[in-house]
C-alpha cells in the first residue's frame, strides 16, 4: 500500500530553496524521504557552481545539534547546498530562558561612577548618569535617562540590533556587539534632544542620530541594502 502524503516538500524561491518538513512523522522517516528526493540528478551540482541556500521549515519539530548535523549531511552530500536557516515553531527550554533574558528590561536608579562596571542581562533603563570612567554593559539595548559621559556596551553577547540611547550623549566610547566608536572631543556630541546609537550594517559602523530620526534612518539603510 502506497503512502499518499509526502513528508518533504521542496519549493524554489528567489533566494534559493525552502524545504517544508512534516512535523508528524518520525525523524528517521524524514531523513529517508529527504535522501530519496535529493538523490535525483536534478539536485546534484559541482563545487564550482554557486551554492544554493536552503531554508528548513521544521513546523512544530525541535531538532538538537546532532539532528541538524545529520540533516546537513544529507543535504550537502554530492551537491553544493548550504543550510542557511532553521525555522521552527518550538524551542528548547534553554533557548526560551535566553530569549526571556534578552527581552526583559531592568530599571536601575543610580549613578555609575568612575571605575564602576555594571552588567545587565537583557535591556537596561538607567535613570541616572554614566560618569567619565564608568561602564555600563547589557546583552540587549541601553537607555540612559541622564548623561552618558562614560562608556556603554550594548549587545554584549553579539546582539547587533541593540541600541544605545541617552538624553545627553557625550560618551568616551560606545560599543554595540563587536563594533566600537571612541570620541576625542566629547563636547561635540552634547545636544538637548535624546540621541541613539545603532549599527549601520551597510557600512559596518556605529551611527548616532536623533531618536526621532530612527524610523527614517532604518528605511534608508534597508533601501541601501537592497540596491
Swiss-Prot record:
Q: What is one Gene Ontology biological process annotated in the Swiss-Prot or TrEMBL record?
A: regulation of cell septum assembly
Q: Which SUPFAM superfamilies match?
A: Cell-division inhibitor MinC, C-terminal domain
Keywords in UniProt for this one? Cell cycle, Cell division, Septation
- Any Pfam family from its record, for instance, is MinC_C
For whether the record's keyword set contains Cell cycle, the answer is yes
Asked whether the keyword Cell cycle is assigned, the reply is yes
Quote the subunit structure annotation: Interacts with MinD and FtsZ.
Q: Provide the family line.
A: Belongs to the MinC family.
Task: Report the function annotation for this chain.
Answer: Cell division inhibitor that blocks the formation of polar Z ring septums. Rapidly oscillates between the poles of the cell to destabilize FtsZ filaments that have formed before they mature into polar Z rings. Prevents FtsZ polymerization.
Protein name as annotated: Probable septum site-determining protein MinC
Question: From which organism does this entry originate?
Answer: Shouchella clausii (strain KSM-K16) (Alkalihalobacillus clausii)
Amino acid at each position: 500500500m502506497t503512502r499518499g502524503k509526502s513528508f518533504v516538500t521542496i519549493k524554489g524561491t528567489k533566494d534559493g530553496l525552502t524545504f517544508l518538513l512534516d512535523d508528524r512523522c518520525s525523524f528517521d522517516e524524514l531523513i529517508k524521504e529527504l535522501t530519496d528526493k535529493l538523490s535525483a540528478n536534478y539536485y546534484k551540482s559541482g563545487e564550482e557552481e554557486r551554492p544554493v541556500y536552503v531554508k528548513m521549515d521544521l513546523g512544530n519539530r525541535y531538532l538538537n545539534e546532532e539532528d541538524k548535523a545529520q540533516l546537513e549531511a544529507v543535504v550537502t552530500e554530492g551537491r553544493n547546498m548550504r543550510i542557511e536557516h532553521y525555522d521552527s515553531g518550538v524551542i528548547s527550554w534553554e533557548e526560551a530562558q535566553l530569549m526571556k533574558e534578552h527581552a526583559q528590561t531592568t530599571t536601575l536608579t543610580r549613578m555609575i561612577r568612575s571605575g564602576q562596571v555594571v552588567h545587565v542581562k537583557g535591556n537596561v533603563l538607567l535613570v541616572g548618569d554614566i560618569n567619565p570612567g564608568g561602564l555600563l554593559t547589557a546583552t540587549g539595548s541601553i537607555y540612559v535617562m541622564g548623561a552618558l559621559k562614560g562608556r556603554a556596551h550594548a549587545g554584549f553577547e553579539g546582539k547587533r540590533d541593540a541600541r544605545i540611547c541617552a538624553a545627553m550623549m557625550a560618551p568616551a566610547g560606545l560599543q554595540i556587539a563587536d563594533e566600537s566608536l571612541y570620541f576625542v572631543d566629547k563636547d561635540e556630541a552634547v545636544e538637548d534632544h535624546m540621541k541613539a546609537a545603532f549599527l549601520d550594517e551597510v557600512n559596518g559602523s556605529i551611527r548616532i542620530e536623533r531618536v526621532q530620526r530612527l524610523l527614517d534612518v532604518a528605511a534608508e539603510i534597508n533601501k541601501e541594502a537592497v540596491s
